[in-house]
């Protein structure tokens, strides 16, 4: 029976849908008018709507005409007419909500109407999806609708140059993945000039598969990093060998639910004996604890052929949800190196963070945000609290006919898989297509072996075979097809009964050498014929599958999240098609083992229940639901915790990025640098005079410190003579005199190098100083967060301590930026070469304003790392992506490894 809250929410949903339906009715009234327009007249509607919006008419008022235009254009280009429920979804998206629409309801087409409407402002629209394939596919297909209406479509994928990316972002509607959009945001905030920027403002984003991107992937931040300077660390191999001698429950404990480890007393003693140290937890040994913890995690929590595979001598992560190999991706904070050491392959060096942001805070930076998914209701509260997004459940175009069978539970995994194969064989024999979901590469290959032994032809989608993934999924609805997919592999590609005609037609057009972007007229002329051929080819097969019962979905294990289970089930029964689903479980499945071991153990130990008996006890199903609720609650709490800590960083990040952008856009820094001079000199004087009387102050040391900052032009004697002796010297007088002297020195510096040269030098030096200190600050904040949990032992709230200390560190960083910039501006060699008399490719140089060539020693050509690493969440929110590139304009400060410096500083303090 639904709760009172559920009933209230249902009433609220009905009211929202009723208001939206009135708008849909207005669109429908315009349909005949727009159908009567010629292609040219329909195209001209875009110019008319843009002009009306520019004159002050709101997008809400323009919505009926804009949606009617898109509906008509889609019919003429794709042969697809928006259903009323698709227009409802589009209205929900325009209003900044999440539209929950079941699988097969045509969410890709839904996004076209709100994207077009919001692009009328000229400020750009981003359509975000989960992988490069879907971004390109959707941009190509839906781009035909937008081009027909006179709008440009772009797509952002990995490997594009900055020039190409800039062009794609300049389009009216740009498709891409969450990681690519986020990385470009970070790269833009590492830029040294406006010419390096690629993105426009964050105006409006429509996030496809929004639950995957904003929920599953929210715990893993986006990170751009470069190789840290310093010696390669030998400790990974040392600790990999050491932990082989340690025993679980004796030397260390493992919490599989929380995925954490803890070292026990006997283990600590063994480590100390092995390393020849007296106390592992002394300050100078702190870094060793991280190596030890990572080595134990690599041994106990990360399993080969489940969490990762070893291919060509490299450890490659496996996506937990899709089962695909995430080529080039790496775990953070030394964990990947620990796994490499465990497997005996080459250990690649650590990296230092150059820029980072969580997806939560990246997407909260959009002026308006919306999303689509088939499964959002279970996370509605989190969407509202974190992103301010409401969830609107859109009714299906046709009532669902899928039958969801009760779970079948067996005592062990072997019997379970035998039953799965028997079921598949029976369905396959009558021509019913079957989609089987597994939770790991290992299990998909085990099932594949069993199917092969029974002579059942099948396709496998997992980490070792994903090149043809979308094509295989698109045809998984053909008669008798058996497809084994590691969880949600191929999500975003519709499984249509009999085969996906649209996908087949697109592939055929590619074979014919036709490209919708390069030659849209030729493409549109040939498309109807090719699509008709594809539809005819699948028509008979469609009828055959309908008679066999539709797509049968088999789950071989419950996922931690009910939402993922629902996504698997949702592959069947699209658009009112018949279908069926069932989950086969065992009491040894990971979910039961970790979260309800007592229930599982009691049944397994019961002699009255044979191994091959299928269990359908109500309390078993209840135990599974409780286990899933526990995991979902834990994951939600982790995401909330990540956000709380990142909110502290986000305020700092916004301040730094806003500052950098104003400098790039040409802010005159003269007054700011003068304040830098005042603050830097003032801080040094304050530090020298904060204790004791004037007679106690070490003025000789003060003058030496100032001489490292700027050329001091006033002597101690000058100051003392001015005040009448040392006994009458006041700190504020000393500070005033020295600040005045420093400002005079800066005026002399300007006279020496020239105003124009100094203004450009100020811009470069301040940017370089911000970049250098921000990178260092990111490390310091990470270091602070790693140990902040220990404050709870002292009865202190870790988050409050993190906020307080983080603020202090941020203020110290700003002081460091000021002092560093002042020192460089005084001491670096600044020169201005004559302006060039001509430019390559410019015939009339008189038409170009020629500026002098400014050179600032040490920062003219920022050093870039040979390889940048781009780390972000995979489709399961767990993994990290790595690829090389130096096109971002990022700078890396040279120097020793910061962990080594930190350790040295600790030793110094102890000494």
Curated annotation (Swiss-Prot):
Write down the Gene3D superfamilies for this protein, in alphabetical order: Helical scaffold and wing domains of SecA (1.10.3060.10), P-loop containing nucleotide triphosphate hydrolases (3.40.50.300), SecA, preprotein cross-linking domain (3.90.1440.10)
Gene Ontology cellular component annotations, sorted alphabetically: cell envelope Sec protein transport complex; cytosol; plasma membrane
Q: From the Swiss-Prot or TrEMBL record, state where the protein is found.
A: Cell membrane; Cytoplasm
What keywords tag this UniProt record?
ATP-binding, Cell membrane, Cytoplasm, Membrane, Nucleotide-binding, Protein transport, Translocase, Translocation, Transport
Q: In what ranges is there compositional bias, type Polar residues? A: 876-889
List positions binding ATP: 86, 104-108, 494
User: In the Enzyme Commission scheme, what number(s) does this protein have?
Assistant: 7.4.2.8
Disordered: annotated span: 856-911
Q: Which domain of life is it from?
A: Bacteria
Q: Listed GO molecular functions? A: ATP binding; protein-exporting ATPase activity
For this chain, the family text in UniProt reads: Belongs to the SecA family.
**Protein purpose:** Part of the Sec protein translocase complex. Interacts with the SecYEG preprotein conducting channel. Has a central role in coupling the hydrolysis of ATP to the transfer of proteins into and across the cell membrane, serving as an ATP-driven molecular motor driving the stepwise translocation of polypeptide chains across the membrane.
Descriptive protein name: Protein translocase subunit SecA
Native source organism of the sequence: Micrococcus luteus (strain ATCC 4698 / DSM 20030 / JCM 1464 / CCM 169 / CCUG 5858 / IAM 1056 / NBRC 3333 / NCIMB 9278 / NCTC 2665 / VKM Ac-2230) (Micrococcus lysodeikticus)
Give the gene symbol: secA
């Amino acid at each position: 029976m639904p709760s009172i809250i559920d009933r209230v929410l249902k009433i609220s949903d009905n009211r929202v849908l009723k208001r939206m339906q009135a708008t849909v009715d207005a669109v429908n009234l315009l349909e005949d008018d727009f159908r009567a327009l010629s292609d040219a007249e329909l195209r001209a509607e875009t110019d008319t709507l843009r002009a009306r919006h520019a004159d002050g008419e709101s997008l809400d008022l323009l919505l009926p005409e804009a949606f009617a235009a898109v509906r008509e254009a889609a019919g003429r280009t794709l042969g697809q007419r928006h259903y009323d429920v698709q227009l409802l979804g589009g209205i929900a998206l325009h209003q900044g909500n999440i539209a929950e629409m079941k699988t097969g309801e045509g969410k890709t087409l839904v996004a076209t109407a709100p994207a077009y409407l919001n692009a009328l402002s000229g400020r750009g629209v981003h359509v975000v999806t989960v992988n490069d394939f879907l971004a390109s596919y959707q941009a190509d297909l839906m781009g035909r609708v937008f081009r027909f209406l006179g709008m440009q479509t772009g797509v952002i994928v990995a490997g594009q140059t900055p020039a190409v990316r800039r062009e794609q972002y300049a389009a009216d509607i740009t498709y891409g993945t969450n990681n690519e959009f986020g990385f470009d945001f970070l790269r833009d905030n590492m830029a040294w000039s406006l010419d390096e920027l690629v993105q426009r403002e964050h105006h409006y984003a429509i996030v496809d598969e929004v639950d995957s991107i904003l929920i599953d992937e929210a715990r893993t931040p986006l990170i751009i990093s470069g190789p840290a300077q310093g010696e390669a660390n030998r400790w990974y191999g040392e600790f990999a060998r050491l932990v082989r001698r340690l025993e679980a429950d004796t030397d260390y404990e493992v919490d599989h639910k929380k995925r954490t480890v803890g070292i026990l007393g006997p283990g600590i003693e063994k480590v100390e004996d092995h390393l020849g140290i007296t106390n592992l937890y002394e300050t100078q040994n702190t870094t060793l604890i991280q190596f030890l913890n990572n080595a134990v995690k690599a041994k106990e929590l990360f399993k080969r052929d489940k969490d990762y595979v070893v291919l060509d001598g490299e450890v490659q992560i496996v996506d937990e949800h899709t089962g695909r190999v995430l080529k080039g991706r790496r775990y953070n904070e030394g964990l990947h190196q620990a796994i490499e050491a465990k497997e005996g392959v080459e250990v690649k060096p650590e990296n230092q963070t150059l820029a980072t942001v969580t997806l939560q805070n990246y997407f909260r930076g959009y002026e308006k945000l919306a999303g689509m998914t088939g499964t959002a209701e279970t996370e509605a509260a989190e969407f509202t609290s974190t992103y301010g997004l409401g969830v609107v459940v859109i009714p299906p175009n046709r009532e669902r006919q899928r039958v969801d069978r009760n779970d079948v539970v067996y005592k062990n995994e072997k019997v379970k898989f035998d039953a799965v194969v028997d079921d598949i064989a029976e369905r396959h024999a009558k021509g019913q297509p079957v989609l089987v979901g597994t939770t790991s590469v290992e299990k998909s290959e085990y099932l594949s072996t069993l199917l092969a032994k029974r002579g059942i032809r099948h396709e496998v989608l997992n980490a070792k075979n994903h090149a043809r993934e979308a094509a295989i999924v698109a045809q998984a609805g053909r008669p008798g097809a058996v497809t084994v997919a590691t969880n949600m592999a191929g999500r975003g590609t519709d499984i249509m009964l009999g085969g996906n005609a649209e996908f087949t037609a697109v592939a055929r057009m590619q074979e014919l050498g036709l490209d919708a972007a390069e030659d849209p007229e030729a493409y549109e002329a040939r498309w109807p014929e090719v699509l008709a051929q594809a539809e005819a080819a699948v028509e008979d097969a469609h009828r055959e599958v309908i008679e066999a019962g539709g797509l049968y979905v088999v789950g071989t294990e419950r996922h931690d999240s009910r939402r993922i289970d629902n996504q698997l089930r949702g592959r069947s029964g699209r658009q009112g098609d018949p279908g069926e689903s069932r989950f086969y479980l065992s009491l040894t499945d990971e979910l039961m083992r970790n979260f309800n071991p007592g229930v599982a153990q009691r049944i397994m130990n019961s002699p009255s229940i044979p191994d091959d008996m299928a269990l359908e006890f109500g309390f078993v199903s209840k135990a599974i639901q409780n286990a899933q609720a526990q995991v979902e609650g834990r994951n939600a709490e982790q995401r909330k915790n990540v956000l709380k800590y990142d909110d502290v960083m986000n305020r700092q990040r916004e301040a730094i990025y806003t500052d950098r952008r104003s400098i790039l856009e040409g802010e005159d820094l003269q007054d700011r640098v003068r304040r830098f001079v005042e603050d830097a000199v003032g801080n040094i004087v304050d530090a020298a005079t904060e204790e004791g009387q004037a007679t106690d102050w070490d003025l000789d040391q003060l003058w030496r410190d100032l001489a490292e900052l700027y050329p001091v032009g006033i002597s101690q004697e000058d100051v003392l003579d001015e005040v009448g002796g040392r006994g009458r010297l006041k700190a504020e007088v000393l500070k005033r005199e020295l600040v005045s002297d420093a400002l005079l020195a800066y005026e002399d510096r300007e006279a020496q190098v020239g105003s124009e040269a100094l203004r450009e030098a100020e811009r470069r030096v301040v940017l370089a100083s911000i970049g250098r200190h921000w990178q260092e600050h990111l490390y310091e904040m990470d270091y602070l967060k790693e140990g902040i949990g220990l404050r709870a032992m002292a009865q202190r709230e870790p988050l409050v301590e993190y906020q307080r200390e983080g603020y202090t560190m941020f203020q110290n960083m700003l002081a460091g930026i000021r002092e560093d910039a002042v020192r460089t501006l005084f001491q670096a060699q600044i020169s201005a070469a004559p302006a060039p008399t001509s430019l390559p490719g410019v015939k009339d140089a008189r038409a170009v304003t020629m500026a002098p060539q400014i050179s600032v020693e040490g920062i003219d050509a920022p050093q870039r790392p040979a390889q940048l690493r781009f780390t972000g969440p995979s489709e399961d929110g767990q993994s990290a992506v790595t690829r090389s590139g130096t096109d971002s304009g990022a700078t890396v400060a040279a120097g020793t490894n910061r962990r080594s410096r930190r350790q040295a500083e600790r030793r110094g303090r102890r000494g």
